Amino acid sequence: MSPTLVVDQENSEEFNTSSFEGPEKLLELWFSAPIKTNLSAGEKANLGLKAVSRNDWDDMLAQAQCKVLSVVNSEEIDAYLLSESSMFVFAHKIILKTCGTTTLLASLPRLLEIASSVGFDRPLRIFYSRKNFLYPERQLAPHTSWEEEVRYLQLFFPSGCSYVVGPTNKNHWHLFSDLADDYSLLEDSLDPEDETLEVLMTDMSPERSLQFYAPSLDVVRSARGDDYVREKNNLSGGHILGSYVADESGVRDLCSTSDKKAVLDAFQFEPIGFSSNMIYKDRYATIHVTPQEHCSYASFETNVSQFQFGRSISETIEKTVKTFGANKFCLTLFQAKGASQEKHFSAKLKSFSSYKREEFIVYDFPGYDLIFASFTAV
């Protein structure tokens, strides 16, 4: 099945223009073993979460205080570009990522109810994580503090564990994780090459930040011609500008796979701010940018492997921070224990050009290793 794009014109022009909380809240729930793809035409399969209606997702997202801008669908993934970040729905797994003062965890009861409606009793694995907030005093319940978030999560997952990774007076990262007693049902089917990279960047260079201030459609027409705009007449203005900004800023190149078959859905907010989702088979990448000088932030997350990108993890990280001109960044890398990991990866993390490594921490989780590292430009 070829990926398809559905644009929600009604929700496509909203944006908060003042100081903005870029760092996202990220929730990931795994419900069961992956359901097979490449089904024969007449075969009826349990699509799991992918069978959930758009109305149900809209209802859930309303609890988190965000809306859908557009959706890219493929056989393996439904990728939702949101007014505040992104959501990725697989048959057995959901990833919800929201920024600003959204109340992501307030959507958890509805999310679990929706999962139950398609046959999932409870998650086999849960991750909730976020970087330290820029404006913690502006957050709404249940996000007014990490302690409050943990208390709320433990109402649903009482055996979950809380971690604060990195120095609390500098860039650091919070994680809540839980495993069901029968997690082994899922562990046997894990992809041995599974890896998820997050690069969380602050203090962007002014030159790079300006790329994510919305140009006018007249500027796009002048640069690319009327045909460029005309061929995208099924898109909203924000999506037309998003496609142009993705090209000009290097975002499209950053998200391109080695076979050039990835599909990108990008949106440029007016007057400022940028979001994009990319899907490739059962893989994704997502980028979100808050370019204001006093609160600049950009994030890049992907589970596309180094083999599919055609470059090493270290090269992807270097390309990412160069694209956004970050003066500070931290990263997290979850890798399956069976992955063909880059040799001497920890040593390579010392040698990014123009950056000093401040922290390097490794956690050993069931089935996965977690690496956290933070860097400052020198």
UniProtKB/Swiss-Prot annotation:
Q: Return the annotated site residues (Cleavage (non-hydrolytic)).
A: E84, S85
Record GO terms (molecular function) = adenosylmethionine decarboxylase activity
Which residue positions are annotated as catalytic?
E21, E24, S85, C99, S275, H288
Source domain of life: Eukaryota
Record-listed Pyruvic acid (Ser) modification sites: S85
* GO cellular component annotations of the record: cytosol; nucleus
What is this protein's name? S-adenosylmethionine decarboxylase proenzyme
User: Which organism was this protein described from?
Assistant: Schizosaccharomyces pombe (strain 972 / ATCC 24843) (Fission yeast)
Source taxonomy: Eukaryota, Fungi, Dikarya, Ascomycota, Taphrinomycotina
Q: Which gene encodes it?
A: spe2
